Regions:
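Conserved alpha-helix/loop element of class I SAM-dependent methyltransferases that forms part
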Residues: 108-121
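Non-catalytic substrate-recognition/targeting regions of SAM-dependent transferases
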Residues: 18-35, 39-105
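Short, Gly/Pro- and small/polar-rich lid/capping loops
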Residues: 2-21
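Serine/threonine-rich low-complexity intrinsically disordered regions
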Residues: 8, 13, 53, 111-113
Length: 121
């Protein structure tokens, strides 16, 4: 019997972010705001051209660079960044910090799951 549960799937979009924003994406990178800091991180799915000008991207506080198809790389900071800082999502407080694997301590796209879990508890 064929499983057709995907036809009844729901798609959720995060709407409760105060401290995260996907600002722009393109050329295999994304420009994101985490609290008051703006970062450039690699993203292989960002294959289009960025919407914003290169000048705008140059305002980033830091950038992660890595070898092609590698998650590990290095951060280069253009402005002073603390070791970690607080990010708010709805009623949650999250510690954000740059990791050697391009992440900043959490995955913003998973926030709909956090909200779903919170609503169940």
């Amino acid at each position: 019997m064929e499983n057709t549960n995907f036809l009844n799937s729901k798609i959720f979009f995060p709407t409760d972010w105060q401290d995260y924003e996907l600002i722009d994406f393109g050329n295999n990178k994304k420009l994101e705001r985490f609290g008051k800091y703006i970062f450039i991180r690699p993203d292989n799915q960002a294959i289009c051209e960025p919407y914003l000008s290169r000048k705008f991207w140059k305002n980033a506080d830091g950038e992660f660079s890595s070898e092609i198809n590698s998650d590990k790389g290095n951060w280069k900071f253009y402005n002073q960044i603390p070791e970690f800082w607080d990010i708010k999502y709805n009623t949650l407080n999250i510690k954000s910090l740059p990791t050697p694997f391009r992440h900043l301590g959490f995955f913003p796209e998973q926030s709909v799951h956090w909200k779903w879990c919170r609503d169940l508890i």
